[in-house]
Amino acid sequence: MWIGIISLFPEMFRAITDYGVTGRAVKNGLLSIQSWSPRDFTHDRHRIVDDRPYGGGPGMLMMVQPLRDAIHAAKAAAGEGAKVIYLSPQGRKLDQAGVSELATNQKLILVCGRYEGIDERVIQTEIDEEWSIGDYVLSGGELPAMTLIDSVSRFIPGVLGHEASATEDSFAEGLLDCPHYTRPEVLEGMEVPPVLLSGNHAEIRRWRLKQSLGRTWLRRPELLENLALTEEQARLLAEFKTEHAQQQHKHDGMA
């Protein structure tokens, strides 16, 4: 996968290119990241990249000419078929389904805004899609862009060590992840669930699915509203609810 970055702070993306899963993907040639700074496309000696908004008000906008020229340079480098994305609080909220959808693209250009944003006409003429990582304000689009790159790159064949890792990730099936355990078997009196030590892969799979369903029901119940549960999932969720109620009753009795 090829990803182009439009950012006033391209050095921030060393966190993606030099470290972790994405760093290995870049090193192994599975992920290619190039960046363009609008500051390199300015025509004045001060390399100004912000401008006042029409109508007044606080803050500045990114200057149109350097930004557009940077986008055009990225498009030229990408060639045909690159989707241009603007990271914006007004965009579609990124979720696992969206990540999976974006991962089908071989080329992405990510535009990172700064200041109060960018001219609406640039969005209309240069941007294919707007995406948001949540309903809150950040200082720029770099962190959302890195979030998008990290999540999308997990779907690139060969990036993850285990072929099933991406499909078994939290949210991959619309559910939260199940609890995980490693050594020691007993930590401050708390034991690893015996089923995970049993070697019975069918029972382990069943336990993990039940815990995933239950954790989603407890923490993010709205996610279940969008799912059509299978017969097995519905049965396991009912079991979890019964067990949870029994545990709560026992806890209340001890209080």
From Swiss-Prot:
Q: Name one GO cellular component term.
A: cytosol
GO biological process terms, alphabetically, are: tRNA N1-guanine methylation
**What Enzyme Commission number does this protein have?**
2.1.1.228
Residues bound to S-adenosyl-L-methionine: G113, I133, G134, D135, Y136, V137, L138
Compartment(s) where it occurs, according to its Swiss-Prot or TrEMBL record? Cytoplasm
EC class? transferase
Under Gene Ontology molecular function, one entry of this record is:
tRNA (guanine(37)-N1)-methyltransferase activity
The domain of life is Bacteria
Question: Could you confirm whether the keyword Methyltransferase appears in this record?
Answer: yes
What this chain does, per the record? Specifically methylates guanosine-37 in various tRNAs.
Protein family according to the UniProt entry = Belongs to the RNA methyltransferase TrmD family.
**Complex and partners:** Homodimer.
Query: What protein is this chain from?
Result: tRNA (guanine-N(1)-)-methyltransferase
State the organism of origin: Escherichia coli O81 (strain ED1a)
Task: Write the gene name.
Answer: trmD
